[in-house]
Regions:
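Intrinsically disordered, low-complexity, charged terminal extensions of DNA damage-control enzymes
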Residues: 1-62
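A broad, low-specificity signal for short, low-complexity segments enriched in glycine/proline
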Residues: 27-35, 68, 80, 84
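Alpha-helix initiation and N-capping motif
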Residues: 30-31, 41-44, 80, 178, ...
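Short helix-loop boundary/capping segments at the starts of domains
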Residues: 53, 72, 76-80, 89-93
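Glycine-/proline-rich flexible loop or hinge segments
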Residues: 62-70, 102-106
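A short secondary-structure junction motif
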Residues: 68-79, 83, 109-116, 169
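Catalytic cores of DNA base-excision repair glycosylases
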Residues: 87-196
Length: 196
C-alpha cells in the first residue's frame, strides 16, 4: 500500500504525458491511504501536506492506453500529445481494427518513428487475430500483467507499469526505474542516489 501512495504524491514531479478528452477518470485514494503514509514517514507526511490532493487522470480504454504509451516513449509530453491528436484525427477512434487497417508508413506520417508504428501495428494485429487477449490481462496479477505486456514488441517493464497505473489503476505499482520518480525521491530525501 505504501508504494501506491508514494507514487501518487511523487507524481506531482512527473509531468502528465497524456490527457484524455471528455469525462475524466482519476486515480482513486482517500484519507485512509493518506493517513497511513503520514504515519509511516515524516518527510512524506510533510510533502503530502505541501502538495495536497492530486487528481491523476486515467485512460479509460486499455487498447488506446497501450498505443498511447508506446507513442509517448522517450518523447516530451507535448510531442506525445501532438502525435496522439494526429492519430485520433486520422483514425477517428483508436481501436485494434482502425490501427490494423493503417499501414506502418501511414502511422509514421503522423509523427512517430517507423519502429513505433510497427510496434503499434503488430500490437493491433495480435489483438485482431486473437493472439493476445487484451481483456484477459485485467484479471492477471501485477507481475503477470507486466510479463504479458512485456512480451509485446516495443513494451518493456516501464511501459507495462505505466499502463497498469494509468489505465488499470493498479494500486501497488511503483515504477522504481522511472527517472522522474528517482528525481522526486532524491529531492524529498536529499540523497544523491536512491536504491531499492
Amino acid at each position: 500500500m505504501l508504494i501506491r501512495y508514494y507514487f501518487c504524491f511523487l507524481s506531482v514531479i512527473i509531468s502528465l504525458y497524456f490527457q484524455k478528452a471528455g469525462a475524466a477518470m482519476f486515480f482513486q485514494y482517500g484519507e485512509k491511504e493518506i493517513n497511513y503514509l503520514k504515519r509511516k514517514d515524516k518527510k512524506l507526511a510533510w510533502a503530502i501536506e505541501q502538495i495536497g490532493h492530486i487528481e491523476r487522470r486515467l485512460d479509460a480504454d486499455l487498447f488506446a492506453s497501450v498505443v498511447r504509451h508506446i507513442v509517448g516513449q522517450q518523447i516530451s509530453s507535448k510531442a506525445q500529445a501532438t502525435v496522439w491528436a494526429r492519430l485520433e484525427a486520422r483514425l477517428s477512434v483508436v481501436t485494434p481494427a482502425s490501427v490494423h487497417a493503417a499501414s506502418p508508413e501511414e502511422l509514421q506520417s503522423l509523427g512517430m518513428s517507423l519502429r513505433k508504428a510497427e510496434y503499434i501495428k503488430d500490437f493491433a494485429s495480435k489483438i485482431v487475430s486473437g493472439e493476445f487477449a487484451l481483456q484477459a490481462v485485467e484479471q492477471l496479477s501485477d507481475e503477470e500483467a507486466i510479463a504479458a505486456f512485456s512480451s509485446l514488441k516495443g513494451i518493456g517493464r516501464w511501459t507495462a507499469e505505466m499502463i497498469l497505473l494509468f489505465c488499470l489503476q493498479r494500486p501497488d505499482i511503483l515504477s522504481f526505474d522511472d527517472l522522474a520518480i528517482q528525481r522526486g525521491l532524491r529531492m524529498l530525501y536529499h540523497h544523491r542516489k536512491i536504491t531499492r
